[in-house]
């Protein structure tokens, strides 16, 4: 394949116009593309193509041998420090195809970072750099082609200065085949074993970039947050999550509820495959200056068996969206540990909930779908939607940085290191690729060889980065390695003893004053002649503990690890302890402190530490008419992680419906009036008053006047009878008046005003009533005059028929 492509590139160089030092003109590129088929690989530099070096690599996340049709995979093109590249081209071809036709290409790429990568204008299926500048890593997503495509070859070309690195087999080519029934049991787990020695300790730092400024569409202002980070360092036999796989119950609870409890339980059940459980606090809100100054971090360790790390955290609120790393390999091919990993993250869907917006109601996905990265074309209501299909803006960045190495280091160097050094051209060996924006100290002297025997090892020198003037330009590593041979051969007896490395020094034998410490090594291989090894296997040296000894001194252990901070947010205290190994010789009390405490600072406390569901609809009004109350509720989706949840879970408000009907309301009936005639047949009446008029369709008022018949003595006939009745009536009135005058004289404290005039008749005909009143003028306070009260009289009027 390489032999066929080299003449193609030479023909391209020969046919084009004169080239500038750094690239082709756009016109030349267009002509070259049209002359050589649908999509030829066009390199943007001048020079001879060379085989790819091992410092450049093309990697599919998880290093799978098989792909699942339709699944998405993260593809990384990287350069090992201090190498770098300025330009690149990345394509995916069906095995055996040249790429001259559109149907030769397999699968589709998805841009992650538009500032780093773009599709080629003259070859839309290929990915290239956005701008020609120094870089050490680019990433894209590749979606596998449909069933029946067969094997696919991912190929990359690298441009560095005037030298073109191009390789069709090796580190810049990745062959991956379709998973069929025969390979269905094969997973996408990494298959390469780690050859590094000892353990390495790393710090994970998480920088959230999701904010209203970067992602304004439907941004949840009050409830935005990152859930607690959960993950582990693990072996290739355990998978926390992966693209194309199904979410476990633990992943589901992180994705939907932000709860890491079940996920941690699942991790701890894999005790043989897990070295460290990785945990970091949640962030409320998702972005603030504190998250940049003191970003959430966690430390973890890896070893030869458990050299992968995975983690995830929920982007909340959301249906089931997360970010994270899956099976990130921290072991290098040259049996070392990666110094630093920087990964930009975009959200992915756990496949357990079908919501499309941040605060969509719960809608379980049945059946459950596979984990996949979100895209800008998923749904028009999605906050990441882009009708043009652009890339999703990054929501977070994670940095993995090696902070310590422990245990034995490898006593060998891979054979290909000598080949790599010898293969470099002389001018490349001497050339310093250090950018002008990176200011270093001088190199330190070379260290002793890592091998203590007659084996191949390596030695190291270091320098210090004093200043980085341009943060966008990466600075090369501060360490340099060189192959060497160890001094482990014994010349005294003509035989060879193979020795191990020295074990770590023991603690000092005393807790005060001067003592000793020792270290050991062992014989890995005795001489063939059966003689004894004369190489020392133990070393002892003096050690001094600063504190002077006295008879009252006591022997104590080393300090233990610090306890966790007493506060989950804000300022708290942390403590560590040690124990007394031996009491003072003089029998006194040991004055050494066995507990030490100091302040610790956790992420800033926030007022919204819990995740709530959206408000429900308002209930019906509590009444059917008039004024009432209605309520709505919401649920606590996940427990508070930084304190109690003080948010209200129920709200109430007033509601108003049409006015209720008001029925007519009347007073009680009055007493019957006197008969309206002095003799013969007549009638009496009684009345009642309207207290409340009917309203809003209430019951109408019934009658307010009732009349009944009455009969007085028979009327006497003749002219003298009328005169007699009038006289009797007059005498009666005089008698009543005289009685009243006597009462007033006997009880002068009860005085009444004169009768008022009669009121107007209540009706014009048919019998009405008139009223008059006598009001009390002066009333005694004594209880024996309680009969002294206002008086009222009624009489009939307008009794003629209507």
Swiss-Prot record:
Cell adhesion protein that promotes the attachment of spinal cord and sensory neuron cells and the outgrowth of neurites in vitro. May contribute to the growth and guidance of axons in both the spinal cord and the PNS. Somite-derived spondin 1 is an inhibitory signal involved in patterning the segmental migration of neural crest cells and their topographical segregation within the rostral somites in vitro. May be required to prevent the lateral drifting of the commissural axons after having crossed the floor plate. GO terms for biological process: cell adhesion. GO terms for cellular component: extracellular matrix; extracellular region. This is Spondin-1. Keywords: Cell adhesion, Disulfide bond, Extracellular matrix, Glycoprotein, Metal-binding, Repeat, Secreted, Signal. The gene is SPON1. The lineage of its organism: Eukaryota, Metazoa, Chordata, Craniata, Vertebrata. One of its GO terms (molecular function) is metal ion binding. Residues 24-189 form the Reelin domain. Ca(2+) binds at residues 320, 349, 353.
């Amino acid at each position: 394949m390489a032999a066929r492509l080299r003449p193609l590139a030479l023909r391209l160089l020969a046919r084009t116009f004169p080239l500038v030092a750094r690239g082709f003109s756009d016109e030349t590129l267009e002509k070259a593309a049209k002359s050589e088929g649908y999509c030829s690989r066009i390199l943007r530099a001048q020079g001879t193509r060379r085989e790819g070096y091992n410092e450049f690599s093309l990697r599919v996340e998880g290093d799978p041998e098989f792909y699942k049709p339709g699944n998405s995979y993260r593809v990384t093109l990287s350069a090992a420090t201090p190498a770098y590249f300025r330009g690149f081209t990345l394509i995916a071809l069906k095995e055996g195809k040249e790429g001259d036709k559109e149907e030769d290409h397999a699968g589709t790429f998805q841009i992650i970072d538009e500032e780093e990568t773009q599709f080629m204008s003259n070859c839309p299926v290929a990915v290239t750099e956005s701008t020609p500048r120094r870089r050490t890593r680019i990433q894209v997503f590749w979606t596998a082609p449909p069933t029946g495509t067969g094997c696919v070859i991912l190929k990359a070309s690298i441009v560095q200065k005037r030298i073109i690195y191009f390789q069709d087999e090796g580190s810049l080519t990745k062959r991956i085949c379709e998973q069929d029934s025969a390979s269905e049991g094969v997973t996408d787990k990494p298959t390469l074993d780690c050859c590094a020695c000892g353990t390495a300790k790393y710090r994970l730092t998480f920088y959230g970039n999701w904010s209203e400024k970067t992602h304004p569409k439907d941004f949840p202002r009050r409830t935005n947050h990152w859930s607690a980070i959960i993950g582990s360092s693990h072996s290739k036999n355990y998978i926390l999550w992966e693209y194309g796989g199904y979410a476990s119950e633990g992943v589901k609870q992180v994705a939907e509820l932000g709860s890491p409890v079940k996920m941690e339980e699942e991790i701890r059940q894999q005790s043989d495959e897990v070295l460290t459980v990785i945990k970091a606090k949640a962030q409320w809100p998702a972005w603030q200056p504190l998250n940049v100054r003191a970003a959430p971090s966690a430390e973890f360790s890896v070893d030869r068996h458990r050299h992968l790390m995975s983690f995830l955290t929920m982007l909340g609120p959301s249906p089931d969206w997360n970010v994270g790393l899956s099976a990130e390999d921290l072991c290098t091919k040259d049996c070392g540990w990666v110094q630093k990993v920087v990964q930009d993250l975009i959200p992915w869907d756990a496949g357990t909930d079908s919501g499309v917006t941040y605060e969509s109601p719960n809608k379980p996905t049945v059946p459950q779908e596979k984990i996949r990265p979100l895209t800008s074309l998923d749904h028009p209501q999605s906050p990441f939607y882009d009708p043009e299909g652009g890339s999703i803006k990054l929501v977070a960045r994670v940095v993995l940085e090696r902070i310590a190495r422990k245990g034995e280091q490898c006593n060998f160097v891979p054979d290909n290191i000598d080949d790599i050094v010898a293969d470099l051209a002389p001018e490349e060996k001497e050339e310093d690729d250090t950018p002008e924006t990176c200011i270093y100290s001088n190199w330190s002297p070379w260290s002793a060889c890592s091998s203590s025997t007659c084996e191949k090892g390596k030695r190291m020198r270091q320098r210090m980065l004093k200043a980085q003037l341009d943060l966008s330009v990466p600075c090369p590593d501060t360490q340099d390695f060189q192959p060497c041979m160890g001094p482990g051969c014994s010349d005294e007896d003509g035989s060879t003893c193979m020795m191990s490395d020295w074990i770590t020094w023991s603690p000092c034998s005393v807790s005060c004053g001067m003592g000793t410490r020792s270290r050991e090594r062992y014989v890995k291989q005795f001489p063939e002649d059966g003689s004894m090894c004369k190489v020392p296997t133990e070393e002892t040296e003096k050690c001094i503990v600063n504190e002077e000894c006295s008879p009252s001194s006591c022997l104590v252990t080393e300090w233990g690890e610090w306890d966790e901070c007493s506060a989950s947010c804000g300022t708290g205290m942390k403590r560590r302890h040690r124990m007394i190994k031996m009491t003072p010789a003089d029998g006194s009390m040991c004055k050494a402190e066995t507990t030490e405490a100091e302040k610790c600072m956790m992420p800033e406390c926030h007022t919204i530490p819990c995740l709530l569901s959206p408000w429900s609809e308002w209930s019906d009004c509590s009444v059917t008419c008039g004024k009432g109350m209605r309520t709505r509720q919401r649920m606590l989706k996940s427990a508070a992680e930084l304190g109690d949840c003080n948010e209200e879970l129920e709200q109430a408000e007033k509601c108003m419906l049409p006015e209720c009907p008001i029925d007519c309301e009347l007073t009680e009936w009055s007493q019957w009036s006197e008969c309206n005639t002095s003799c013969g047949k007549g009638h009496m009446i009684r009345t009642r008053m309207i207290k409340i008029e009917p309203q809003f369709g209430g019951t109408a008022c019934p009658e307010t006047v009732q009349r009944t018949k009455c009969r007085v003595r028979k009327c006497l006939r003749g002219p003298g009878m009328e005169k007699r009745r009038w006289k009797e009536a007059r005498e009666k009135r005089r008698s009543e008046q005289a009685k009243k005058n006597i009462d007033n004289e006997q009880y002068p404290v009860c005085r009444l005003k004169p009768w008022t005039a009669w009121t107007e008749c209540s009706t014009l005909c048919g019998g009405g009533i008139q009223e008059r009143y006598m009001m009390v003028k002066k009333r005694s306070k004594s209880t024996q005059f309680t009969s002294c009260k206002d008086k009222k009289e009624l009489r009939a009027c307008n009794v003629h028929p209507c």
